[in-house]
């Protein structure tokens, strides 16, 4: 599939901002199944300084500073990407999950060393006995890792309700686990917490999810969504992606922007401002297919 993606973020401030320094993580990664033919970032007001670099995890970041007084900041990322159906070029090896746990600390290959760092607590994800207990209902003795991961993904999808009104970006997995409600970020954090609590390596993936209008209705510009899902390291195979919000294995409708230990590593836009007072935030995402699009039932949540 080929997509044109427009991600527009608008901050409106009650009072003028005299100086704002920001970091944008809005350019798609290049992967074996994902290529970007065009990617640009439009910023208003025009930044006084602007630099780009790759972070520790390989994500593409843009650092910029706006020094003129402003009551509105608009950051618009435009990308054109080509994505194949699967990031995994082979069938996952049916490795028992316990063997995967033992293999990662002893894997000194570049892939193994990279995976090892995703097995620990991170600023937004703590390891808890209750998470391990929940995970072990799926990770029964000697069960193949891919099968257990699929089962856990389905359980989270069934046991938790999508509800954008009960959480925010700072809600910890412990609270989500109690309330049994949340959004994609919450369910990704929760699944990662469960997996790390049983010593598996799992990372947080941010990106875009294509949505589909109801039958007979036109596609609405700006109605697509930023999204989050989970990637788990399977020794001998590589990274396997799972979307607990929609009970899906990500395919050509999921476009990866970035990955890290948790949301804090891959926030689309963050920074510091001087002034401004209160503010409002509006985000619109448009993911337009540029080639023939198949008909798909259902409306995924994000």
Role assignments for model-derived ranges:
Residues 93, 158, 168, 172-173, ...:
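Glycine-rich, flexible loop/turn motifs
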Residues 13, 81, 234, 287-289:
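Short beta-strand segments enriched in hydrophobic/aromatic residues
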């Amino acid at each position: 599939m080929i997509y044109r993606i427009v991600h527009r973020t608008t901050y409106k401030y009650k009072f003028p901002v005299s100086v704002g320094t920001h970091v944008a993580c809005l350019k798609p990664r290049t992967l074996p199944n994902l290529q970007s033919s065009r990617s640009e970032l439009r910023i208003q007001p025009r930044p006084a300084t602007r630099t780009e670099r790759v972070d520790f995890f390989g994500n593409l970041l843009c650092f910029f500073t706006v020094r003129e007084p402003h009551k509105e900041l608009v950051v618009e990322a435009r990308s054109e990407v080509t994505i194949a159906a699967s990031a995994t070029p082979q069938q996952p090896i049916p490795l028992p999950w316990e063997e995967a746990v033992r293999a990662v600390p002893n894997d000194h290959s570049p892939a193994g060393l990279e995976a090892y760092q995703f097995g620990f607590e991170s600023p937004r994800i703590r390891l808890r006995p209750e998470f391990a207990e929940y995970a072990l209902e799926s990770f029964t003795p000697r069960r193949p890792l891919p099968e257990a991961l699929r089962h856990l993904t389905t359980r989270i999808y069934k046991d938790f309700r999508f509800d954008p009104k009960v959480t925010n970006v700072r809600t910890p997995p412990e609270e989500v686990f109690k309330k049994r409600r949340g959004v994609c970020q919450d369910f990704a954090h929760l699944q990662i917490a469960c997996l790390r609590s049983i010593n598996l390596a799992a990372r947080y993936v941010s990106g875009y999810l294509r949505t589909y209008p109801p039958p007979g209705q036109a596609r609405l510009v700006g109605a697509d969504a930023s999204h989050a899902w989970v990637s788990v390291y399977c020794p001998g195979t590589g990274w396997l992606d799972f979307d607990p919000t929609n009970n899906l294995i990500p395919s050509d409708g999921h476009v990866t922007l970035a990955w890290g230990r948790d949301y804090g590593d891959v926030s689309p836009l963050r920074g510091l401002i001087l002034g401004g007072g209160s503010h409002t935030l509006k985000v619109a995402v448009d993911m337009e297919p540029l080639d023939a699009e198949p008909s798909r039932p259902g409306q995924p949540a994000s």
